[in-house]
Amino acid sequence: MASDHVDVLIIGAGLSGIGAACHLRRDCPDKTYAVLEARDAIGGTWDLFRYPGIRSDSDMFTLGYSFKPWTAPKAIADGTTILEYVRETAREYDVPRHIRFRHRVLRAEWDSDTARWTVHAQRTDTAEIVVLTCSFLFACAGYYRYDEGYTPPLPGVDAYAGRLVHPQHWPDDLDHSGKRVVVIGSGATAVTLVPAMAQRAAHVTMLQRSPTYILALPARDRLADAVRRRLPAKAAYPVVRWKNVLLSTVNFQLSRRAPGLVKRVLRRAARGLLPVGYDVDRHFSPRYNPWDQRLCVAPDGDLFTAVRDGTASVVTDTIDTFTASGVRLTSGAEVPADIVVTATGLNLLALGGLTLRVDGVDVDLPSTVAYKGMMLSGVPNFALTLGYTNASWTLKADLVAGYLCRLLRHLDRTGQQVVTPLPPPDAERVPLIDLRSGYVLRAVDTLPKQGATAPWRLHQNYARDVLLMRHGRLTDEGVRFSRAGEVTVPEDTRRPVASERR
């Protein structure tokens, strides 16, 4: 990078960060930018996770970028293919030369007099502190800790003589061929791992405390195949993308408005894929409503096939203690295991652990309110990417990056330099992420909040957000535009969080 000052500094070179850089290249080609990436490769999640079967749990027509058609055969794709898609996109837009690898961002300090961020990063290879400045800071570092997955207390684990691994740090030398494997967990990672490992293992047991809703979907989208045969890729892609957006929106809205009906449909579908007499209620019927937690996807019903074929089984119970040869359950049964995989979740980490300071005052993230799900009250010229909880991550990431480019062009047109979100006029606050999953509940008190009404309310609705973020007004009651040296957030708008609803 020729200069240590850029117009836009992007944190993270994963799916969101690469997309943000491409949007800048497409929509704001006059803006200078750099990307700081803590690791030594492009790809984020898709470069980090290496466990067997790693794949998307959203279709790639919506997880892919809006400007880069997904052309691979499978709609639910493997991690290697997704990683190559991200890297290919980066190359097409000349992003790699703007990336500083092995730079972990530590803190960023905003100065209103100069209308600039001063960003402190540490090189992960030399421990050297690097200082850069930027006019706009864009956090695309994901939502979880890369260096540490979540593992709950495991009673007696020190007595276990087998191999214990976490999917987030999969060992290169682990060979599970012919081994007895226990996968602890029932979320997306477990649902992915079990059928993949069952192909070579002696047997795989999915040990879950409680079940998850699992939906079998075809790995290939037959309608997409038909459309792609008749239309060029650039024409077919948005058609299939919107078809999938509408289907997922209907699924979510129906789950919210008629949860009993959706429960019955999912239960009936699972029962049809499992052996006759299988205890579907115990192992595949959760106590909560659909979309209180994310639905898991089984491409081509692979998990159900493994259970039906006897290469995998599901045990719903709690752990009493580990033994030398496996796991003893509260029921008294013991599950033998040569390998135990703790697919027990992630540790959420807001902004990748970045600390923010505005004019010498530390920003308390839980006291901020998200504006349009992408900026924080009282924090000037700062944006973050937080994807949808009920649809693919990239749908929202694309909208956020596009909206940021609209903001930058607006600032240039009007001669302004600073945009600062304001807190909502009412005192009501709700959690930013509306899920009851364990990884969310463990971290909810460390995250920003959302308000009760727009533009501080997240609606988790892509079609609605397209109207708001691509075509809506940039000037509203939620933001203030100003120049360097001007007061950006009046004192009387710095309201405390007086009430909170969960």
Where are these regions (language model features)?
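Short hydrophobic core segments
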Residues: 11, 105, 131-144, 181-184, ...
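Feature captures the FAD/FMN-dependent oxidoreductase FAD-binding
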Residues: 73-145, 306, 321
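Rossmann-like dinucleotide-binding core of oxidoreductases
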Residues: 2-5, 9-11, 15, 19-20, ...
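C-terminal active-site-capping segments
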Residues: 398, 402-502
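Glycine/threonine-rich phosphate-binding loop and adjacent beta-strand/alpha-helix elements that clamp
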Residues: 51, 343-411
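Short beta-strand to alpha-helix junction loop
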Residues: 70-88, 100, 184, 254-263, ...
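Beta1-alpha1 glycine-rich phosphate/pyrophosphate-binding loop at the start
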Residues: 6-10, 15-99, 208-209, 272-278
